[in-house]
Amino acid sequence: MNLILLLVIGFLVFIGTYMILSLNLIRIVIGISIYTHAGNLIIMSMGHYSNKMTEPLIHGSNTNYVDPLLQAIVLTAIVIGFAMTAFLLVLVYRTYRVTKEANIDVLRGEEDENEQ
C-alpha cells in the first residue's frame, strides 16, 4: 500500500511539474492544483500509526487507526486549494478576456533592444 501511494504521489508531482513548465496559463493553474493534491496525499500518508500503538481512550484493541489532526489539516488544505484554484482560474479568464492570449511568452511583451 505504501509503495502504491508513493508511486501515485511521484506521478502527481511529475505531472504537476510538467504542466507548470508549460506556456499555457490554464495548464499552469491545473499543475498547481495537482501539486496541492500531491501535498495532501503526503500529509495523509504520515497519519497512519503502527499496530503496537493503541487508541488513547480505548484499551485492549490492536486495530489500526489514523491521526484525526492530519485529516483536519488536509481538509483545510483542500478548501484553501480549491479557493486558490478558483481565484487563479478567474485571474486567467480575466487576463484572456483583456489580452486575448493565454500564452506566457506573448504576455511578457517584447524587450527593448536599446536598453541594457
Curated annotation (Swiss-Prot):
A GO cellular-component term linked to this record: plasma membrane
Subunit description: May form a heterooligomeric complex that consists of seven subunits: mnhA2, mnhB2, mnhC2, mnhD2, mnhE2, mnhF2 and mnhG2.
Family: Belongs to the CPA3 antiporters (TC 2.A.63) subunit C family.
Keywords for the protein's UniProt record, in alphabetical order: Antiport, Cell membrane, Ion transport, Membrane, Transmembrane, Transmembrane helix, Transport
Places the protein is found: Cell membrane
One Pfam match: Oxidored_q2
Residue ranges of the TM segments: 3-23, 28-48, 72-92
GO biological-process terms attached to the record: monoatomic ion transport
Molecular functions per Gene Ontology: antiporter activity
Protein name: Putative antiporter subunit mnhC2
Membrane-related topology note: Multi-pass membrane protein
